[in-house]
């Protein structure tokens, strides 16, 4: 049984925030779009790939949101695993005023997912002062350049202290039993990640190290992103891949770990 069969329903992450993701069959990449519900309206963050579209939409309906009430689609960078379904989403939302929000730099590439007559729907978060407010709920956008695209950013919901971190804090793998992170007490001081002292097959710390070494371009970009994230008081980190971090101890641990991770991208090759 794969994970999408195990968790075939939306999962509440924080007040008004729902995981509406699925497991990409045939890969280990577990994609996590998130729906933020404010009164009877909603915002979708990193909406998912084309092949995820039907499953994501099913979960949005299960939350009780009519697609017509989605007012904004936020894309924290331009990769196909989060942007692939943008055209399908615009079609099904049938909202002529829907906004597709991203950075000026990422907009260049996101436009390639759309027909020309829809380019006007893409708006720059910079033009909103790096914030977006829906019925008094304000999301703040924090630039994390080159982590991993030039226009990458993360999104902070002050009301629930949730950080939507896109590829940051992601993993290629995930706990199969649960979408939430579950680090054992002895893991924080473990020095033999390649060979788990407890005999477990999956090491979530190693998985996160490997993901960032592969996906991020260099140490400087990753360390800078962590220095910006460290300034924020966060209760939950909701990444686009892997598991959701919800314990302060785990959040601090991984901010510090990724903030000094070596052999990242080109730095691990030269
Ligand atoms: Fe990406
Ligand atoms: Fe991704």
Cite the ranges covered by each PLM segment.
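Active-site neighborhood of phospho(di)ester-bond hydrolases with catalytic His/Asp-centered motifs
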Residues: 45-47, 69-78, 100-104, 163-166, ...
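Binuclear metal-ion centers of metallo-dependent hydrolases, dominated by the metallo-beta-lactamase
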Residues: 233-270
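Short, flexible loop segments at the rims of nucleotide/cofactor-binding pockets, characterized by
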Residues: 19-25, 76-78, 139-145, 213-217
């Amino acid at each position: 049984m794969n994970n999408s069969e195990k968790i075939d329903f939306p999962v509440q992450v924080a007040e008004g925030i729902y995981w509406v993701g699925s497991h990409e069959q045939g890969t280990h990449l577990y994609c996590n779009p998130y729906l933020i519900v404010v009164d009877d309206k909603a915002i979708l963050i990193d909406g998912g790939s084309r092949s995820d579209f039907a499953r994501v939409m099913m979960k949005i309906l299960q939350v009780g949101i009519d697609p017509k009430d989605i007012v904004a689609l936020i894309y924290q960078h331009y990769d196909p695993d989060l942007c692939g379904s943008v055209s399908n989403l615009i079609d099904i939302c049938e909202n002529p005023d829907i906004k597709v929000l991203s950075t000026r730099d990422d907009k260049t590439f996101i436009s390639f997912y759309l027909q020309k007559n829809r380019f006007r729907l893409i708006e720059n978060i910079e033009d909103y002062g790096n914030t977006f407010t829906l019925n008094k709920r304000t999301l703040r956008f924090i630039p994390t350049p080159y982590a991993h695209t030039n226009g990458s950013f993360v999104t902070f919901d002050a009301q629930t202290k949730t950080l939507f971190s896109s590829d940051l804090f992601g993993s290629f793998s995930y706990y199969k039993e649960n979408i939430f992170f579950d680090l054992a007490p002895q893991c924080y001081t473990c020095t033999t990640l390649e060979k788990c002292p407890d005999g477990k097959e999956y090491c979530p710390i190693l998985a996160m190290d490997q993901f960032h070494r592969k996906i991020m371009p260099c140490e400087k970009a990753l360390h800078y992103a962590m220095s910006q994230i460290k300034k924020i008081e966060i209760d939950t980190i909701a990444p686009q891949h892997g598991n959701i971090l919800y314990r302060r101890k785990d959040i601090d641990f991984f901010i510090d770990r990724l903030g000094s991770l070596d052999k990242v991208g080109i730095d691990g090759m030269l």
